[in-house]
Amino acid sequence: MKRQLALGTNNLNKVKEVSSILMELGIQILTPKDLKVSFNPEETGSTFKENALIKAKELFYLTKIPSIADDSGICVSALKDEPGVYSARFGGPELNDEGRALLLLEKLKGNQNRKAYYACAIAYVDESTEQSFEGRCEGLISEEYDRIGIYGFGYDPIFIFPPLQKPFSQIQEETKNSVSHRKKALDELLKFLKTKP
């Protein structure tokens, strides 16, 4: 039987990204929907790591299947690392991904400091273990929203990846998945999972 991990997200883009990266270990990823559980934990942590652990613990409690969850976001130097853990809620619940990205551009208007990084913390929880892994991807915030790119989600249309000098929204998934903050955290998780029976 395939090894199974429950993934604490309802975001299909994250499911796809995590599944493609963990495929090499032959791990079957199960979502809350697959497991028919209602999963909507309150993210009350002040760090990505705390929020990831809240989600992984909740999912393990509901399913009793070894669980992973991530919390990630974008941190902008000129905004004192905001929106940070509030990235998905930045600007309020009425904004979608594009609205949040445009609001971020508005807040940076005229600011020369465009440094930013994507951060990701992934937590693993089972009956005897609580572990977390972190990754970062450094970049810059663009001057305008990219309407050409067809890849990615969230803040990808305004996040410039310096080695390729283009926004994540113009970088194919395989390439992005090899350099992303989530990939770096998942690589650490992979190392850990290889040591677990």
Swiss-Prot record:
Its EC number is 3.6.1.66. NCBIfam families: RdgB/HAM1 family non-canonical purine NTP pyrophosphatase (TIGR00042). One of its GO terms (biological process) is nucleoside triphosphate catabolic process. It catalyses: XTP + H2O = XMP + diphosphate + H(+); dITP + H2O = dIMP + diphosphate + H(+); ITP + H2O = IMP + diphosphate + H(+). The keyword Hydrolase applies. Mg(2+) binds at E42, D71. Signal peptide: none annotated. It comes from Leptospira interrogans serogroup Icterohaemorrhagiae serovar Lai (strain 56601). Its cofactor is Mg(2+). Transmembrane segments: none annotated. CDD domains: HAM1. The active site is at D71. The lineage of its organism: Bacteria, Pseudomonadati, Spirochaetota, Spirochaetia, Leptospirales. InterPro entries: dITP/XTP_pyrophosphatase (IPR020922), ITPase-like_fam (IPR029001), RdgB/HAM1 (IPR002637). The keyword Magnesium applies. One of its GO terms (cellular component) is cytoplasm. Pyrophosphatase that catalyzes the hydrolysis of nucleoside triphosphates to their monophosphate derivatives, with a high preference for the non-canonical purine nucleotides XTP (xanthosine triphosphate), dITP (deoxyinosine triphosphate) and ITP. Seems to function as a house-cleaning enzyme that removes non-canonical purine nucleotides from the nucleotide pool, thus preventing their incorporation into DNA/RNA and avoiding chromosomal lesions. One of its GO terms (molecular function) is metal ion binding. Belongs to the HAM1 NTPase family. This is dITP/XTP pyrophosphatase.
